[in-house]
């Protein structure tokens, strides 16, 4: 997707106009305009010039991003800086100064008798001329509203500035007419008419409208600037210089001058400038800036390092492998920025409304004036109602409702190592009903390790490990690697062997000194060595637990048994529990045999295990699961790319520095399964925030426009002064943006944000754990529409003495109830249905 910078947009109607204009360009397949970042993403074959011309023809400006060969992070950060708020603050200060003077003469003197210069006293024409002059000054200060508003109107695409310009202009125009009419009456000596026209002045309304809208614009601009804080903080991480080796000398150069293949050095305390490979030295590197992981990572020769991470202890000499826009940091920044420029499906309704909103409001204002005139009201009353309609209506609140929440939610994710590639992914993740987890590398560490050492009579554990290490030292098998790593960790050094053979039937043999060493699977060893029945029973039990038992012998006498297994990640059980507590069904996909798979599944606590699935078969399983609900597939993005692509949400876990995984729509930088429920939780919070924003934006306009038009005046006598309408409009967008900023306070790990319990050294199934688990029930509920519904159901359920807690989700339509003691399903059902929701099932 090609990115463009767009200038001149002031509200949602503007972005809708630009999007519509560019979408009509031949060759454009899709176009997405972001009012928040003043950017546009375009896909298709149309040239840059054709796209820019379309934007210019619509009345705005555009230029391709990165028109320069390469834009530094500092320049990108500068582009994101809030340049608008300082300008608005100056405009507001000047406007307020002249408005205070205007209000003194227009209201203070008339209502409270405040003193005025002698030349003005009882000189109504002079007072009117002064008010007109002060209003003109304020209009000139805020000329942007008129230039933008009427330019857009001439292009057939009226925007929010058009409403402000028409409202303030109508107030000023009618007041100017009244001033000239009053002057004529003064000349004729008709003092009654003079006093009547004095009350027809709306100069202060025109000035107040412009000033209050500027207040709102400044507050909105400041709040919008806050939404890009996460992106700007990422950009600040980028080093500005690097120390490279040129002609054998160390030279400090700009980061833009570093090229792939350059040798650079990093001393303790310095940030690593670009991605690279360590050529010399060792150190501990803090990668928290990229991964959020606070524990430093040891680096040595051959290790990879990433830009913006901090060298803490040693001297490193490295070779640059990825520079400029190819570094991990640049990819993350681009991913976050591109996601902010895309649109979520939920925004479509707001976009449709924004496209016709301003013309509809102008029409309503004209009809309002005509109706009140036909009803017998004077022109001043009718005009005030029409102006109120113009200035209270706010398309910006509609246009900002979705993008500000997407930007803040996406930034929160990036800070926590959760990268959403686009707004669609951020929305879809929250709708997940089923999570399919790949086993190897996702639930488990992906690296087999020794879990049990059971020596035969006459052998110690160390004797057995020494024998196994000597035999396995010449093997390349993954299980041999696990044995060797355990031996190294326990301080066992290998003794040289010769005549090593890998025998048919999963067996090994070698000669150590004069002793023949044998090792291998139970079936192989039973045929070659006499094995004690107790060891065979233990081997059977270990196999049932998903472990691989290996027998070892010396001179055909069994020395004992060592079990090896791919062990669970420490946080896997907790992550699965969190997903289930959120009302999500958890399934494990694996190519392992059913016995091993079920053992691992039981340890992790998943709802279902699908075993014997080859990598190419995972996609078919995901296709089947999608028939049952929205599916998120979690894998490493290597051998499960088709499954990740097929799922509604593909989540790649443990990406580390390789964040550009094409198959996944969500990338988890850390190899931490708890980030999966965190991503879903963040998505749900963002969706909830969008719903709140859209509700407020629609509710505000639906309530405000009829009130401004005077619909309730005949019944209750309610009418709205245009100045109060302008005040309401100025605050509406600010409220939407401020509500989105609340996401910055959201904890992605929620109540579960505590350290995961460390896994025991031997990974075993403890049958007693299933009996000790707290009882839970999942209720399927229809009728919940929002966060308020969730709170109502949660409060009702938790009022029951047997209920410890209730986790309610209106998106999933579930309530997961944790019970301290048994409670009848009928009681739970009645409790919820008394709140006017329907319970369809209880699991």
What are these regions, as identified by a protein language model?
Residues 1-128, 233, 249-252, 334-342, ...:
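Flexible metal-binding regulatory segments at protein termini and peripheral loops
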Residues 16, 29, 430-432, 512-514, ...:
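Conserved ATP-binding TGD loop and adjacent catalytic N/P-domain core of P-type ATPases
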Residues 26-43, 48-49, 200-201, 232-326, ...:
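Conserved cytosolic catalytic loops of P-type ATPases
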Residues 76, 182-185, 190-193, 207-268, ...:
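Juxtamembrane coupling segments of multi-pass membrane pumps/enzymes
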Residues 87-241, 352, 717-722, 728, ...:
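Transmembrane helix-loop-helix hairpins at the membrane interface
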Residues 90, 309, 433-476, 506-587, ...:
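ATP-driven catalytic headpiece of P-type ATPases
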Residues 111-125, 154, 173, 412, ...:
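Membrane-embedded alpha-helical bundles of multi-pass transporters
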Residues 290, 349, 384, 397-471, ...:
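Conserved catalytic phosphorylation-site environment of P-type ATPases
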């Amino acid at each position: 997707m090609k990115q463009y910078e767009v200038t001149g947009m002031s509200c949602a109607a503007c972005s809708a106009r630009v999007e519509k204009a560019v979408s009509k360009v031949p060759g454009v397949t899709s176009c997405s305009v972001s009012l928040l970042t003043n950017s546009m993403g375009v896909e298709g074959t149309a040239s840059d010039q054709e796209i820019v011309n379309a934007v210019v023809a619509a009345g705005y400006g555009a230029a391709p991003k990165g028109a320069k060969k390469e834009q530094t992070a500092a320049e990108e950060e500068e582009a994101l800086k809030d340049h608008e708020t300082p300008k608005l603050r100056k405009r507001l200060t000047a406007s307020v100064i002249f408005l205070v003077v205007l209000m003194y003469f227009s209201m203070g003197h008339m209502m409270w008798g405040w003193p005025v210069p002698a030349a003005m006293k009882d000189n109504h024409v002079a007072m009117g001329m002064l008010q007109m002059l002060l209003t003109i000054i304020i209009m000139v200060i805020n000329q942007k509203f008129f230039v933008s508003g009427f330019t857009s109107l001439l292009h057939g695409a009226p925007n929010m500035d058009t409403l402000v310009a028409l409202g303030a202009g109508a107030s000023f125009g009618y007041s100017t007419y009244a001033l000239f009419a009053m002057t004529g009456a003064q000349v004729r000596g008709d003092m009654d008419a003079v006093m009547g026209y004095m009350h027809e002045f709306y100069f202060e309304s025109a000035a107040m409208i412009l000033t209050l809208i500027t207040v709102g614009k400044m507050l909105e601009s400041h709040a919008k600037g806050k939404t890009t804080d996460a992106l700007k903080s990422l950009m600040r991480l980028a080093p500005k210089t690097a120390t490279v080796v040129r002609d054998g000398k160390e030279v400090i150069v700009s980061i833009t001058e570093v090229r792939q293949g350059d040798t650079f050095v990093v001393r303790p305390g310095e940030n690593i400038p670009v991605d690279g490979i360590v050529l010399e030295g060792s150190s501990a590197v803090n990668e928290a800036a990229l991964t959020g992981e606070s524990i430093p990572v040891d680096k040595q020769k051959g290790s990879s390092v990433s830009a913006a991470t901090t060298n803490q202890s040693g001297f490193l000499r490295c070779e640059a492998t990825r520079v400029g826009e190819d570094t991990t940091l640049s990819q993350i920044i681009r991913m976050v920025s591109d996601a902010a420029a895309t649109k979520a499906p939920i925004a479509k309704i707001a976009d449709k409304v924004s496209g016709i909103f301003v013309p509809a409001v102008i029409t309503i204002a004209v009809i309002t004036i005509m109706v009140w005139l036909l009803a017998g009201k004077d022109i001043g009353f009718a005009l005030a109602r029409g102006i109120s309609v113009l200035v209270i209506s706010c398309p910006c609140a509609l246009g900002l409702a979705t993008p500000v929440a997407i930007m803040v939610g996406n930034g929160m994710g990036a800070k926590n190592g959760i990268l959403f590639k686009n707004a669609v992914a951020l929305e879809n993740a929250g709708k997940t009903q089923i999570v399919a987890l790949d086993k190897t590398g996702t639930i488990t560490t992906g690296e087999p390790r020794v879990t049990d050492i059971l020596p035969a009579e006459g052998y110690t554990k160390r004797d057995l490990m020494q024998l196994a290490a000597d035999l396995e030292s010449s093997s390349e098998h993954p299980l041999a690697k696990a044995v060797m790593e355990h031996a190294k960790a326990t301080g066992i050094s290998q003794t040289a062997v010769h005549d090593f053979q890998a025998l048919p039937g999963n067996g090994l043999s070698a000669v150590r000194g004069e002793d023949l060493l044998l090792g291998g699977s139970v079936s192989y060893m039973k045929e070659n060595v006499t094995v004690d029945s107790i060891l065979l029973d233990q081997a059977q039990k270990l196999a049932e637990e998903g472990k691989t038992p290996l027998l070892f012998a010396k001179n055909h006498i069994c020395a004992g048994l060592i079990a090896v297994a791919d062990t669970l990640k420490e946080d896997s059980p907790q992550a699965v529990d969190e997903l289930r507590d959120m009302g999500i069904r958890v399934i494990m996909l694996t190519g392992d045999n059913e016995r091993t798979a079920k053992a691992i599944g039981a340890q992790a606590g998943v709802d279902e295990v699908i075993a014997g699935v080859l990598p190419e078969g995972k996609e078919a399983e995901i296709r089947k699961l999608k028939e049952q609900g929205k599916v998120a597939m979690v894998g490493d993005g290597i051998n499960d790319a088709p499954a990740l692509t097929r799922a509604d949400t593909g989540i790649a876990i443990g990406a580390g520095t390789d964040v550009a995984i094409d198959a996944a729509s969500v990338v988890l930088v850390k190899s931490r399964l708890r980030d999966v429920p965190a991503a879903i939780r963040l998505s749900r919070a963002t969706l909830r925030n969008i719903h709140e924003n859209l509700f407020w934006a629609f509710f505000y306009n639906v309530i405000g426009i009829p009130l401004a038009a005077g619909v309730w005046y005949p019944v209750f006598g309610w009418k709205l002064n245009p100045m109060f309408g302008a005040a309401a409009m100025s605050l509406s967008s600010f409220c939407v943006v401020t509500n989105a900023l609340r996401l910055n306070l959201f904890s992605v790990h929620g109540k579960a944000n505590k350290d995961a319990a460390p896994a025991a050294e031997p990974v075993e199934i403890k049958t007693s754990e299933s009996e000790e688990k707290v009882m839970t029930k999942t209720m399927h509920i229809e009728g919940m529409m929002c966060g308020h519904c969730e709170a109502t159901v949660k409060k009702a359920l938790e009022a029951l003495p047997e209920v410890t807690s209730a986790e309610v989700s209106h998106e999933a339509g579930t309530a997961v109830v944790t019970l301290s003691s048994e409670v009848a399903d009928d009681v739970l059902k009645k409790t919820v249905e008394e709140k006017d929701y329907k319970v369809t099932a209880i699991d």
